[in-house]
Each structure stands twice: as structure tokens, then as C-alpha cells.
């Protein structure tokens, strides 16, 4: 069998994604990958898929062609796996499990994390959105610049998770301060200092959730933690405390920084494409289309952080991925693949108008929440936060504009912001 030679010897995709040029704009490099090296083998031996069709297939094939790492196998990919609290927690999360364990855990949590139950949070989310916008209004009306990233995009998911988990807001702000640190420490090329910092933050989160679970067990309320503490399936199986902690840790990691980044990108789209703001002034279906296009254009997690292990030799595009190889998918690239989305670099909410969530009018799937058995449980929660925020920002601040150049965090994994300065412009200015 002829095997296409990749360009790993002269170009490592993960190193390139961490470069200043890619931090600023990764999409030209992703286009290069799709066209020249769509099944890329990095210097570390990891494989990275960049075409929509291959990524979509890999998502669907998880549990068949791919599996999660077996217990103890993380040491192949992370040298400190045996001693790292963060990596041990990662290994215990739902995202790392295969059927039948995955099936059992997913069933238990899905009973209390349905789309309908998340929709029931809309009034609370709307209240939080209104309060945060009230808080920044005086400064904006005085003509001052406001960092919308810090004052709104970061704060909203923190406060929503506090509501969801039934915990004090101040406690959530303290825990959330370490989430970005944990995520960077779990990257495929994280340094020892980054992993050590992640471990310290994870230990704090783990201890807090252990205490929270005990409080909910003795004094249950109408929140997701209380529901999970009492969750059981048809065999009266219950979640252990260790499973509960890893579940909550995984939910917070997967849904906090990424939601904040999506809010930032949505505001960026509002300001960069004023001709598209009309999508936020009409019915809910048009708002949903705007939200889906934001999620497609700028996936907050550019590639999958979870190792997917090939269960057999797999040939994609003339490249053989050997059995037991670690395969990751470049989600942000798949979302910009012209074979899936026409004119993919153009921001066009119409491509998602009147469709099922995540599906374009051409029947292609937006990849930011994954697909298949590991589809993101928090997808609806993120969508609701965006849908409740954007029309209110547009209505409250129709003259909102940039107050300076937004700055990004120097991350190869997360496409997130450090600052997003905005101010109000006088009408007609």
C-alpha cells in the first residue's frame, strides 16, 4: 500500500498553532493543512486530522475505530500521569470513557441535564445577563472603555455555573480562576511547570467539590449537584463520590472558558459585521442561526484535548494511522472546510437558519460540540447563554464599538481572549 509522506519533518502543526502568527489568525495555516497535510503526524507522534469529513467520521467512529486510553495508559502520552491529580481526574471523566462504562455514566447524568431542564434556566440566565449589563452601563454611558471579556464574557458562565451547581457566587469565582490554568496543563505539549500549576488548581477544585457533594447529600436543593447525588439508573446504581467529582470537574472545564470565548467571539462578530446585526433583532430562530455561525466560525477549543486511540490500522487520505496511535482532530479547521461550508471564511448566519441545532442548510454538522457518543453535554447550556446575551447587548448598546485592539491569550489549544475593550460611540459618529 502506498502511504503518503506527511510534512512532519519540516513542520509540526502543534508548534505552528502556538506561534504568534497563529495566535493572531490560525486559519491560513489550517487551510494549508487541509490542502497539503490533512492527516498530519506531529513530531511527538500524534496524528491530527483537519478535514471536516475525516473529523466527522472520527467523531462517529469513537467506540469503534477509536477508544479512550485504558487505565494506566495515559503515561504513554503524559509522563507524569501516575502522579498528577489533574491527569488522574482527566482519566476519570466521561470524555475518556468507552461503552459500557460511558453508557452508564452518560445515562445517569443525562436524566438531570436535558435540553428541557437547561431551557428552564433561561429566566435565571436572563436575570444574570441583565444584572451584568446593568453593571457596565454607567461606565459606558460616561464614555469610558470597558473590558467586556472580564466584566461580562467571563463573569456570565461563572455565575450560571454557580446557579446550576447551587453554590455561592464567590466560591465559583475562586474556583474559576484556575480553570484556564488546568486546561493549559492538560494540553498535549504542556510543560512540567504548566502541569504542576494545573495540579495545584485541580486539587483545590477537587477538595471543594468533595465538600459540596457532602453538603448536598445532607441538604439537597433544586440544583444539578443535588440531582446527581441522587441519580440512579434502572438497577438503582448510583454515582460514587469520585465519579461525581470527576463529572463536576469535567463540566466546569468543558463549559466555562469555552463559553466565555464564544461570547467574546459573538460580540466580535457583532462589531466586525454590523450588517449582520439584524439577525439579533428578530425571532428566536434568527438568533439561533447567528449563534450557530459564531460557533462555526471560531471554535473556542481548536483541537480535541482528549487522546483517541486507534484500535486498528486506519487509512485516511492515503496515510496509514497505526494501531494504538494517538489521534486528535482540529475542530476549528473542520468548521472552515470549504468542502463542508461554502465560502467558509465569510460570516453568514443564513447557513444555519431554519435548521436543527448545529446543522447547516446543506446538511453539514458544525463540529464545535463534537458528535457521536461524546457530543458535549453542555452544548445547550452554552447556546442558551449566547442566545440570552446577544439580543440584550444589541438592544441595550446599539452603538457599541471597539475601544482598542482585542488581545488574545497565547494558547495553541484555546482560542480565547485576554481583553475585549469596548465603548459607546455617539450616534452618527
Swiss-Prot record:
Cofactor section: heme
Matching PROSITE patterns: CYTOCHROME_P450
GO molecular function: heme binding; iron ion binding; monooxygenase activity; oxidoreductase activity, acting on paired donors, with incorporation or reduction of molecular oxygen
EC annotation from Swiss-Prot or TrEMBL: 1.14.14.-
Keywords: Heme, Iron, Metal-binding, Monooxygenase, Oxidoreductase
Pfam families in the record: p450
Top-level taxon of origin: Bacteria
Residues that hold heme according to the record: 376
Enzyme class at the top of the EC tree: oxidoreductase
Known function: Cytochromes P450 are a group of heme-thiolate monooxygenases. They oxidize a variety of structurally unrelated compounds, including steroids, fatty acids, and xenobiotics.
Family that this chain belongs to: Belongs to the cytochrome P450 family.
The protein's name in its UniProt record: Cytochrome P450 BJ-3
Organism of provenance: Bradyrhizobium diazoefficiens (strain JCM 10833 / BCRC 13528 / IAM 13628 / NBRC 14792 / USDA 110)
Amino acid at each position: 500500500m502506498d502511504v503518503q509522506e506527511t510534512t512532519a519533518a519540516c513542520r509540526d502543526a502543534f508548534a505552528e498553532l502556538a506561534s504568534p502568527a497563529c495566535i493572531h489568525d490560525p486559519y491560513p495555516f489550517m487551510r494549508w493543512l487541509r490542502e497539503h497535510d490533512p492527516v498530519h503526524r506531529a513530531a511527538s507522534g500524534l496524528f491530527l486530522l483537519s478535514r471536516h469529513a475525516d473529523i466527522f467520521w472520527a467523531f462517529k467512529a469513537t467506540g469503534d475505530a477509536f477508544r479512550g486510553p485504558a487505565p494506566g495508559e495515559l503515561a504513554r502520552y503524559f509522563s507524569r500521569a501516575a502522579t498528577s491529580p489533574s491527569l488522574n481526574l482527566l482519566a476519570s471523566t466521561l470524555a475518556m470513557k468507552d461503552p459500557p462504562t460511558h453508557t452508564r455514566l452518560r445515562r445517569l447524568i443525562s436524566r438531570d441535564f436535558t435540553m428541557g431542564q437547561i431551557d428552564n434556566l433561561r429566566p435565571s440566565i436572563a436575570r444574570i445577563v441583565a444584572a451584568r449589563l446593568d453593571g457596565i452601563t454607567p461606565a459606558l454611558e460616561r464614555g469610558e472603555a470597558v473590558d467586556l471579556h472580564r466584566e461580562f464574557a467571563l463573569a456570565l458562565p461563572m455565575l450560571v455555573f454557580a446557579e446550576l451547581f447551587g453554590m455561592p457566587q464567590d466560591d465559583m469565582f475562586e474556583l474559576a480562576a484556575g480553570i484556564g490554568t488546568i486546561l493549559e496543563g492538560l494540553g498535549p505539549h504542556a510543560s512540567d511547570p504548566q502541569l504542576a500549576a494545573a495540579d495545584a488548581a485541580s486539587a483545590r477544585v477537587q477538595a471543594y467539590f468533595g465538600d459540596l457533594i457532602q453538603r448536598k447529600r445532607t441538604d439537597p436543593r433544586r440544583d444539578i449537584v443535588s440531582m446527581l447525588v441522587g441519580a440512579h439508573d434502572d438497577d438503582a446504581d448510583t454515582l460514587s463520590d469520585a465519579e461525581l467529582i470527576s463529572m463536576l470537574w469535567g463540566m466546569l472545564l468543558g463549559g466555562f472558558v469555552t463559553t466565555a470565548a464564544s461570547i467574546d467571539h459573538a460580540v466580535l462578530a457583532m462589531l466586525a459585521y454590523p450588517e449582520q446585526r439584524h439577525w439579533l433583532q428578530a425571532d428566536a430562530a434568527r438568533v439561533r442561526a447567528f449563534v450557530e455561525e459564531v460557533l462555526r466560525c471560531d471554535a473556542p477549543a481548536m483541537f480535541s484535548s482528549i487522546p483517541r486511540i486507534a484500535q486498528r490500522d486506519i487509512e485516511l487520505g492515503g496515510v496509514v494511522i497505526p494501531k494504538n496511535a494517538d489521534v486528535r482532530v482540529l475542530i476549528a479547521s473542520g468548521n472552515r472546510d470549504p468542502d463542508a461550508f461554502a465560502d467558509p471564511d465569510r460570516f453568514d448566519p443564513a447557513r444555519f437558519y431554519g435548521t436543527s441545532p448545529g446543522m447547516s442548510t446543506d446538511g453539514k454538522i458544525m463540529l464545535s460540540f463534537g458528535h457521536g457518543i461524546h457530543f458535549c453535554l453542555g452544548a445547550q447550556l452554552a447556546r442558551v447563554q449566547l442566545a440570552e446575551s446577544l439580543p440584550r447587548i444589541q438592544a441595550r448598546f446599539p452603538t457599541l464599538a471597539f475601544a482598542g485592539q482585542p488581545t488574545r491569550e497565547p494558547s495553541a489549544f484555546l482560542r480565547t481572549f485576554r481583553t475585549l475593550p469596548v465603548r459607546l460611540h455617539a450616534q452618527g459618529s
